[in-house]
Amino acid sequence: MTIETQEEPPEIKVYLPRVGITNLKSVAKIEWKGRIYTFIPTFEVAIDLPEEKKGIHMSRLVESITETMSEAVEEEVKKVHTSLEDLALCIIRRIEKKHSHKRAEVWIKSTLILERQTPASGKTSYEPYDVEVGVIKNSDGSIKKVLKVKVIGNTACPHAMANNQGKTHIQRAIAELEIETHFNEDIALEDMIEVVESSFSSPTYTLLKTPDENAVVRRMYENPKFVEDVAREIVYKARNRFKGKIHVKVISHESIHKHDVIAEVWA
């Protein structure tokens, strides 16, 4: 007979709002716009723990992940997940069958690879974007989601350009866009990436032939921006396209300084 020490009372009775597992890696397949995308996501799953119980049953959280994606579970195979948040919600629904709780969270981090065309030669380039999706079930049963994207671009300094006969310094910039919204709100990670990427002086590319490199440099010089300009443009576009709480953070890795610069905004 198994002794369930998790069900015993703790020495110190304190309610814990988040207890679970983190840094669990697995594999997931998502169908989007008629294509199957394979991800190697990292999961963080947490539930709340009442003050009268010593611990949670960690293995049940792991089972909820593996069973959701396992071909051994027939009802899951019949439904191909259409998004990372759909996958996260299915994990929460499975936790509901395995472990008592009032509140639950599933966070999924991964890399989304999108096909792009280089600006001059038109060659195909595959670009990586860090994404994160969180689905949260509150104690009242309501469901919300958090979508995050991180995009790499670049900026050309307008101040140096204005004071140096058109010459300026260029740096890599990294922008993050986060949206917290109702679960049923339809927001695609690809659309969030497009909002961010179009707000830099220029996008960056994995593949650049000489004509492409020249095109990127010209675009940067034709479109100089402070990090502040990038943050403002992202939040402006995001407010016009998406519903929810918006957070934008842009960091510019300065090429002429030993420090970086940052701009951040909430809306």
From Swiss-Prot:
Keywords from the UniProt entry: Hydrolase, Iron, Metal-binding
Cofactor annotation: Fe(2+)
Annotated site location: May be catalytically important: 157
UniProt keyword Metal-binding, yes or no: yes
Record text on cofactor binding: Binds 1 Fe(2+) ion per subunit.
Pathway noted in the entry: Cofactor biosynthesis; 5,6,7,8-tetrahydromethanopterin biosynthesis
Catalytic activities: GTP + H2O = 7,8-dihydroneopterin 2',3'-cyclic phosphate + formate + diphosphate + H(+)
EC number(s) per entry: 3.5.4.39
UniProt record, GO biological process: tetrahydromethanopterin biosynthetic process
Enzyme superclass (EC): hydrolase
One MF annotation (Gene Ontology) recorded for this entry: GTP cyclohydrolase I activity
Record function comment: Converts GTP to 7,8-dihydro-D-neopterin 2',3'-cyclic phosphate, the first intermediate in the biosynthesis of coenzyme methanopterin.
Assembly and interaction partners: Homodimer.
HAMAP family documented for this protein: GTP_cyclohydrol_A
Family indicated by similarity: Belongs to the GTP cyclohydrolase IV family.
Cross-referenced NCBIfam families: PRK13675.1-1
Record's protein name: GTP cyclohydrolase MptA
Organism encoding this protein: Pyrococcus furiosus (strain ATCC 43587 / DSM 3638 / JCM 8422 / Vc1)
Gene: mptA
